[in-house]
């Protein structure tokens, strides 16, 4: 079980949005590289990064900030937002990313995702962002008619490293993770699922460690970490203890 601290990039800065709204952005750090190093120093083992501008533009916008992050931390980094082509995937992986997250293109061109998994085994994740139970695309700005599980099942057996499932209706407002929907997805597919959107307190970490959530790879935390609602040491100690028990 992994707790992924999140760095969302808007105009080169670390921000958190409310409900995916770019107009409701709170700046937490103007130096993404320093924030990445701070998370590493706190004991986190992975980093989740999103290029928010890129998600809307359909191409990388905050590339300099991502490069600064990669230079500042030894931890593996996963990146989503605006990655839409095989060349783009290859370019980022060659620059040191551990894995890319494909969201909009997973809806628009699932064949590309399958091909990417063949070319870059273990380095391609799919981001499923849902609003009102339906998949959203283009930086959450457009709704589709696709169901969450319907989309996930398209990639069974393709070699997708993980599915990052975000409930947009809870993202950035500390409402708690949508456990019912998240666990339903985890039970429906064999691909590891990472929960995102709404993680609010240490209670969500404890919930993540319950036996019925064993199929989850982990969860992503943003605002709760930045606001001090979750103590990194306490959270990581809980996860470590749970791993030792399961071992």
Curated annotation (Swiss-Prot):
GO terms for molecular function: 1-(5-phosphoribosyl)-5-[(5-phosphoribosylamino)methylideneamino]imidazole-4-carboxamide isomerase activity. The active site is at residues 8, 129. It comes from the Bacteria. Pathway: Amino-acid biosynthesis; L-histidine biosynthesis; L-histidine from 5-phospho-alpha-D-ribose 1-diphosphate: step 4/9. GO terms for cellular component: cytoplasm. It catalyses: 1-(5-phospho-beta-D-ribosyl)-5-[(5-phospho-beta-D-ribosylamino)methylideneamino]imidazole-4-carboxamide = 5-[(5-phospho-1-deoxy-D-ribulos-1-ylimino)methylamino]-1-(5-phospho-beta-D-ribosyl)imidazole-4-carboxamide. It is found in: Cytoplasm. GO terms for biological process: L-histidine biosynthetic process; L-tryptophan biosynthetic process. It is an enzyme of class 5 (isomerase). Its EC number is 5.3.1.16. The keyword Cytoplasm applies. Gene3D superfamilies: Aldolase class I. Its main location: cytoplasm. InterPro entries: Aldolase_TIM (IPR013785), His_biosynth (IPR006062), HisA_bact_arch (IPR006063), Isoase_HisA-like (IPR044524), Isoase_HisA-like_bact (IPR023016), RibuloseP-bd_barrel (IPR011060). The keyword Cell inner membrane does not apply. Keywords: Amino-acid biosynthesis, Cytoplasm, Histidine biosynthesis, Isomerase. Belongs to the HisA/HisF family. This is 1-(5-phosphoribosyl)-5-[(5-phosphoribosylamino)methylideneamino] imidazole-4-carboxamide isomerase. It comes from Agrobacterium fabrum (strain C58 / ATCC 33970) (Agrobacterium tumefaciens (strain C58)).
